[in-house]
Regions:
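Central antiparallel beta-sheet cores of small beta-barrel/beta-sandwich binding domains
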Residues: 25-135, 141-159
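Bacterial N-terminal signal peptides
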Residues: 8-19
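Bacterial Sec-dependent signal peptides at the C-terminal "C-region" and cleavage site
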Residues: 19-25
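Positively charged n-region of N-terminal signal peptides that target proteins for export
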Residues: 1-6
């Protein structure tokens, strides 16, 4: 899998699951709707790093149990667009995603609890683990993976 595609898969999965713990009384996606932007750093297999810029747009279902997301990210060497659909049922997260310019997609699953969200993301020849936290209008994402893309740390804020 190419470096750009691996990065797109991991970063996109992380962003689509940026769930807010402060809205636990309703569905886990309540309060997430809108546009979020931010920056971070990606670590590659050879130890090098690249800065990345992202913009996520979230549409939340009426019961706040479903999320549709579009994510645009870019670094100095590539860009990508990811779309995702995520459902929450009793603290269990599941969904699908696709990267439109590379015609690839996969599944995701995980658990939410105590303000921490642990998610496994998969596609053919790619897996990643994500840890997510949201506090008010700020989101932090930490990603770990094997292969050409080793990980990322990204901070977002709501516009």
């Amino acid at each position: 899998m190419s470096r750009g595609l691996s990065t797109a898969c991991a970063v996109g999965a992380a962003m689509m699951l940026s769930v807010s713990a402060s809205y636990a009384g309703a569905g886990p996606f309540e309060g997430l709707a809108g546009v979020w932007t931010g920056r971070g750093t990606i670590q590659l297999e050879d130890g090098s790093t690249e800065k990345i810029r992202c913009k996520a747009t979230y549409a939340v279902s009426g019961d706040a149990q479903g999320l549709n997301q579009t994510l645009l990210c870019a670094s100095d060497s590539y860009k990508f667009e990811l779309k995702s659909n995520v459902l929450a049922q009793g603290g269990v997260l599941s969904g699908t995603w696709s990267e439109t310019s590379r015609n690839v997609g996969g599944t995701l699953g995980g658990r939410a609890g105590n303000g921490q969200f642990n998610v496994d993301v998969s596609a053919p020849a790619f897996t990643a683990k994500l840890k997510l936290t949201t506090n008010g209008n700020r989101q932090n994402v930490v990603i770990s993976s094997e292969g050409q893309f080793r990980g990322a740390s990204i901070s977002l804020s709501r516009s």
